[in-house]
Amino acid sequence: MYVLKGNIMKAGKIWGTTELVEANCALEFHRIEMKKGGICSKHLHEYKWNGFFVESGIMKVSVWQKDYDLIDETILKPGDYTKVKPGLYHQFECIESGVAFELYWATFDHNDIVRETVGKIKSDE
């Protein structure tokens, strides 16, 4: 549950807190405070990218590739950034308490059209 704090929505999590700073048609931007040892749920986003930028502390981001046995682990220290593609299970773990920023955005293929027929001019019959 988010609580309004000024213009910012803040929610408590088992691993810390998340503050919704901005949400619009292009992106979501969150400030997260992480507790050492905190781990978020393993989850995926069907359509959204998920980016992580660490301001302080240390965060580990695990990403399960399509071959479920292959797990990529990235250690993020202050100033580091990584992103996760849509459709991949991922999870973060707080190695050292700190603050990070989380971004979500979706992309679309400008050529995402599937034609069943082709255009034509109807003749006068």
What are these regions (language model features)?
Residues K10-A11, E93-E125:
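Double-stranded beta-helix
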Residues I39-S41, G79-Q91, D109:
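Histidine-centered metal-chelating micro-motifs
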Residues I58-K60, Y81, Y89, V99:
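Structural motif
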Residues I32-F52:
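Short, well-structured hydrophobic secondary-structure segments
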Residues M1-R31, I39-K42, E73-T74, E116-E125:
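A short, N-terminal "cap"/entry segment at the start of jelly-roll beta-barrel domains
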